[in-house]
Regions:
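Patatin-like phospholipase
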Residues: 1-115
Length: 115
């Protein structure tokens, strides 16, 4: 709470805020964590996971709408959809899952910076 106001994460309304850098950066790179497909599940998600998944779906819709109108120079979309909401303890596995994305990003970013 700040000055009597409850604040929420800015990602709630602007989950991919590349547009805030328009005209202020030579190269804009955005990491989209909202568009990754979710994992197939056979168990019932918790109430918290249902709420969070709803937020992810809404965030994905916002990102898709934003990208339809404008785009950053590079959008990175790592395959994080296979992980669950509270899998922070799986940092090593999450980073390992991004290895394939890393090679593509290095190539594209190198081309952008060389231009």
């Amino acid at each position: 709470m700040v000055d009597g106001r409850i604040l929420v994460d800015g990602g709630t309304t602007n989950p991919l805020p590349f547009d805030t850098l328009a005209g202020r950066a030579d190269v804009v790179v955005a990491v989209d964590l909202f568009s990754a497909p979710g994992a197939d599940r056979t168990d019932m998600p918790s109430t918290w996971e249902c709420v969070y998944t709803t937020i992810l779906v809404m965030g994905g819709a916002i990102v898709a709408a934003k990208l339809a109108h404008a785009a950053p120079d590079l959008v990175i979309q790592p395959n994080v959809g296979i992980f669950r909401t509270l899998d922070f303890y799986q940092a090593t596995a999450i980073l390992r899952s991004a290895e394939a994305t890393k090679a593509v990003v290095k190539e594209r970013l190198g081309a952008l910076l060389a231009a």
